[in-house]
Amino acid sequence: MKPIPKYIALLLVIIGFYACASTGMPDGGPYDETPPKFVRATPEPNATNNKRKKISIEFDEYIKLDKASEKVIISPPQNEAPEVKVSGHRVLVEFFDTLRENTTYTVDFGDAIVDNNEDNPLGNFAYAFSTGEHIDTMEVSGTVLSADNLEPVKGIQVGLHKNLEDSAFVKLPFDRISRTDSRGHFTIRGVAPGKYRIYALMDGNQNYLFDSKTEAIAFLDSLVVPDMRPDVRQDTVWNELDTLAYDTIYEVHYTRFLPDNLILRSFKEENPMQYLVKSEREQLNRFSLYFSAKADTLPTIKGLDFDEKDAFIIESNPRNDTIRYWIKDTVMCERDTLTFQMDYLATDTLGQLVPKTDTLRMVNKIDKKRRMALAEEAMKKEEKERKKRAKKGDTLKVEPKFFAMSVDAPSSLDLNRNIVLKFEEPVEHIDTEAIHMAVKVDSLWEDIPFILMADSVVPRQYQILADWQPGQEYQLKIDSLGIKGIYGLYTNKVENQLKVKTLEDYGTLYLNIVGAGPHAVVQLLNSSDGVVRQQPVTDKNTCDFYFLQPSTKYYIRLFNDDNNNGVWDTGNYEEKRQPEEVYYFPKVWEMKANFEFEETWDIHAVPLDKQKLDEIKKQKPDEAKKIKDRNKERARKLGRT
């Protein structure tokens, strides 16, 4: 027998190798799940009598800092920010301020220290030393929430003052400090025994004290007294392959630092500084004035190159901080510039409201020459189109120009709604005889009475109110020329037919409120945390919502309306007035047609930081690392489940 040629033998070996090999792709091995381990530090952790301003903290592998400017907190606060950097396996910290005597310093890294390859975080890592004989080790922790909507507040400073005077917050930097994470949580470390005031501050100028009304703040009325005690908690070792199964539950003995559940409600004070922010002539026929704060009165205008008497229709919002002036005279509208003297109240250097006079020039964005050129160009274009059509024997129909009006009268009208008329420009006159409402009775339309009412909040908006009956059909007619605008145009005719929904089309929610104040207001919210409807709690501590849409999710918020003005009000530090309290019902309702829900709500039953559902929070927690999940997925692919 002839020997097998070498190339055939080699081919057989290769075929045999592939026949025995796995058909899958080569596996690169498990992911690194181990965070960096602390090895040593100079000075040693919790060292006393330290005078060194340079710190070196070493780990067992190459590391990096993740978002150090957000996550690394140094206490007490420093006038000149220390330098924090990475060098291989080490974190280096250098202080530039003179170290204070007999003071505990903490460098809280949070989860900023991660390994160089997989970003595994060394969570909850902090380093401390003392310049004196003793090191302070107690902690104070809690959560900062936005007072008006219970959103977690990320990145706000939280500080302690040993000085218990109210003035300390506005005159002195904090003694100890921390910063909230994405969940609003904070931990102030290195705290000595004693009594403290606690504050939160969104410190825009980084001076660690409240000196600007634009800064969000929070404060507690009560003192904070740090304490600690031994405690036991249960911990769990989870199954590596099954996230729903655990291997072991064991007890962990630890030192619990108190208080650990403080709630601070963050708010911005009402801006007390009154001044003109800007003036703007948005269009030929109107201009607007914008002020920095709400006002009790409107400014007074005196024309310097025109007669201001009966010259404007004025629209202002409820705060009187945004005011729109519609110019009634069309000739006056065409003027490039309007100059006037404005008298109003403004805040002086002493913080007092005093009379002030400004001279303002309202300039058209497009001057008259350019406007005339544009108009001539449009006329030429129209004439060209007319001649083109004329050659074809076609005539260009001249469309009359009407006063623009939109009618919100849906074909299926909710029982708790009305027909709404909206106008782009102010209305001069409404002929109510030209408006007709009718109901269908045995296939015939019968006129019914109605009320036409101007909206008290929204300018240029009117509502048509009638005795809407469930399941009935209605007809709205508005004759042409029935409504006239201030520039002489009239509305076109309108005809709408609509049918009112039945009672069976809605769900109903009955609430029994426990723990609310004497003037509480309940707000029904949508999935964007926006207010759909609101109404006060009754003397019997009930609040009922009718005509709720089926297959719609509703959420509920309550605020204690202390001054009984129907709106939520912010706080004031100088007056020691907290913002009005807000609560969320930690539940969502998905309404059903022809279905009634009844619920008792104790507003204090669930801690404040657990009340607002995650699904409607805008401030989401930072994404946690999920390397272990990747290893579980790898195990499944390898058939090791």
Question: What residue ranges belong to the model's regions?
Answer:
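N-terminal targeting or signal-anchor segments and their processing/structural boundaries
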Residues: 2-641
